[in-house]
């Protein structure tokens, strides 16, 4: 029978463990602070930002928010970033993507203080990750590692196929899994839209991570017997229901369970972990900036 890896439960445990670290910092006068920056009025982005603010409130992290008009020049956003870089109450912040077309997101990330870059996207933090000295692991890849750990799935010596090469998931996860570490030591294949014979590469993997942003791209015929399947994708597809849509992953769930030994659902798998690891990185940022040691889960 296929094990369903419950991301909600694992994320809840991590949040519970973080509350002790947050209390330690708060008692020392250094309550962690996380800011979100939203440029424009994208409905999905507004939803994500609201969820992150609620997460902060639940664990005792101070939450700050900055709205920037979507028609404002890039310099307006840059000024807000500069102010956050100088704000000692804000230990970490994120600039919610996507930004409007007239703003270069890479330039936005370059302007973020690397010590407050709790997304882990700044070039300095990317370099540290590749070198095996990560300050902040990007939230989704770190969440995937924590899910595997919680399910007692060892990556050492395993063949891992990652479907997707994004800067947010595919690339950093590959770099994390090849590190000489207890949650690494894997042999990793990264596939993408130009990969030939994708199914052959996924079928031979011990662990398949689907992170291509393509609804139900990976089906059961592409999963080897006994493989572990981590579905990072969250896609809206049309459906005959009250909402008019449903959420599906990058994996065709029902057929994949015929072969997989373990699988993450959508929703309720990787998504909650991404949010939990943002809290984790914020607490770590506060610990580093305030020079106060705390135990992290």
Swiss-Prot record:
Protein name: Bifunctional protein FolD
GO cellular component: cytosol
Summary of subunit composition and partner proteins: Homodimer.
Species classification: Archaea, Methanobacteriati, Methanobacteriota, Stenosarchaea group, Halobacteria
Superkingdom per UniProt: Archaea
EC number(s) from the headed UniProt entry: 1.5.1.5, 3.5.4.9
CDD domains (alphabetical): NAD_bind_m-THF_DH_Cyclohyd
Record GO biological process: L-histidine biosynthetic process; methionine biosynthetic process; purine nucleotide biosynthetic process; tetrahydrofolate interconversion
PANTHER family from the UniProt entry: C-1-TETRAHYDROFOLATE SYNTHASE, CYTOPLASMIC (PTHR48099:SF5), C-1-TETRAHYDROFOLATE SYNTHASE, CYTOPLASMIC-RELATED (PTHR48099)
Presence of the UniProt keyword NAD in the record: no
The organism of origin for this protein: Natronomonas pharaonis (strain ATCC 35678 / DSM 2160 / CIP 103997 / JCM 8858 / NBRC 14720 / NCIMB 2260 / Gabara) (Halobacterium pharaonis)
